[in-house]
């Protein structure tokens, strides 16, 4: 039974598991083969079953298997090895073989039923010529048989070339196969993709079927030496096939040269020292009528039915490389699904784990506005650690949220960092590096101080014009910039508002100034805005000159004023300090020349210089919308020269300078450092305090403005996402939060910002002002539609008036419009409005106290307490607390109050009375009644 194929081995060759054994047995029944779990089958049966399972070729099996009980028949190869009669078996095999040679010549081959020792059966299950059921005995062919074999070669040459072409095309590319094998190759390809990589490797390896020539062992040659010596030397089968093989090789070379095709890969020989393998993978039939082989020859030709031992490693590597390349292409393909993206994100997560090994920097430099992830990158910290630290401190942020100054300071303390904040906009600006000779420039002087201390009047006297009278209420509400000439030298003055609402405007004035003049009224002394102005000047690191105004008034105490300044750290020169205190009178003009000379001396000491060549860099002091001009801005140049026709951008605004007008109303063409002018040609009103940058053309200006707009939009979204735990708690607790939606319109950008900040300061935990829209310019129909869509909304206008059409639309929409010319009135009216929405403060007033001496239970009425008034007056219907042993038991109202049997409105101290509470009867002797009334008071902001 050595030639039989075990069913389990057959399953292993197919790459199937024991679970699929039942399906294989059912498929064997379809071709007439009865199998069981431990059954064995002949190689012929195994081959037909393999073709049926893999290729779908159904060949019925004739049941000619030997009966195991008939031991004398010697039907199995094992029994044939015993010494029995040989001649009858050979003749029987011939008689069975001849009829099949006439019908199917190309599907016949010798069967491995021989009596020789050392016979090896090899099976690849892909042989193109299936073996016959009963193989003939092997004998040595004659010379005529050799000639017939050569003639047979010519007859099958056409079919051999077609099959050879099919084999070659399958080796290069499975998709270029002929139509006869195309469907089979596609089905096999789909099956290979569905199975495991091991099955894929086994099925992709090229297999070959051939004849194995096996030599006798030395002991066999010795036992049969007498038989072989008596025979004459004849040509062996190996020689026959070697001649045939040479002819094929010569014809193959001619065919390949003509078609310029690639040479097929050589098949590695089996590792057997005593055997030779001849490749017949092209289904060539060499079975002739006289192909009878002698058993007694030294060499035997057997049909190869075993799988090839040596695997083609190069093909295996190529298959694996193709799979890897295809997977790599799919991962990098942008049109694929998200699988590749997830793969890359895993790599990023592995990379992030290495962040724990980073060396944290001790000193870092960051911009004023920095995101969480940017801070982590600058400090070389793990992003998760930064977010976790903020979370533990009660602030929930994402990596794209911006950090405020407090958060940056907290992170610096937590991670032991030293942080320097840089005030740059390099990411959004295209400022060129200015190279050239620096020239002397005029000083920029900012006049600051408390409201109504005479700042604008001082500047008015210097300019000899009545500027203060043009402001509403005599209060400066805009930044004014002017140029004044003194002793042949120019000085630029910036007048800032003194009202508390204009803190940001004073801050902008201090940032662009060289010298700060603090105006203090000699009869009023240092006030709140005076201290604030000094703080702005200190932060800007600019020298300070004190102007003691209103010296013309009586009862002026200069020593008191100097003492107040000295307490703040500003010691006068005559007191041994370094600060100049100059007495002036803006009304009479006394001391103004001395002030100007002091300013020029300070400017000479500072040696103020700037580069005049190149692109301009300026600061926007104020922006507004003027009728007939559109958006305009007051700017002061810091470096370079701004000319008419130059392209520029400032924050989200951009444009080209159309006109420039100085403080005298004259048109100018060029604006040099420290000069101020009003420019037109802007796309929108720029924010006050923004930096104006001159660029090469309009395209660059538009691009930079769009970048800045995107940045500001992200920052605004970041503010809406950040929330603290305390804010969440307040939002949950204050379900009845009241707010007033407003639309604010003003004539200038600076005034608009001042109003917004002042109104937002009025917000508290109960009521709030919600600014749904704000802008510079007149009231439009768009503003009305915004207010109409919001309940209880109002429009606030500052220094503007609605047109007739807008008024009609407002009546139609039932929208309230309120306009103001003084900021005081606007803020106070909104304060009153908020106070009206706020719930009043409730206070309690103690009115009386009574002690329970006896209780009376009256059916269907309740419990009446007999009391004595010990303090105050007890009134009917008043609120009362029932106190027992110092603990409040009940709070309610007095339902009935009687004096003996008569009803009483009130009972005074020292008198007895009867008290019955509303819906409460659990009164005991010794309890105390305490009466009180609630007083509602208005809240204050």
UniProtKB/Swiss-Prot annotation:
Region of interest called Disordered, as start-end residue ranges on this chain: 61-204, 249-274
Keyword set, alphabetical order: Cytoplasm, GTP-binding, Initiation factor, Nucleotide-binding, Protein biosynthesis
Gene Ontology terms: cellular component: cytosol
Cytoplasm keyword on record: yes
UniProt xrefs under Gene3D superfamilies: P-loop containing nucleotide triphosphate hydrolases, Translation factors, Translation initiation factor IF- 2, domain 3
GO molecular function, a single term: GTPase activity
Region named G1: 449-456
Protein name: Translation initiation factor IF-2
Organism, scientific name: Helicobacter acinonychis (strain Sheeba)
Gene: infB
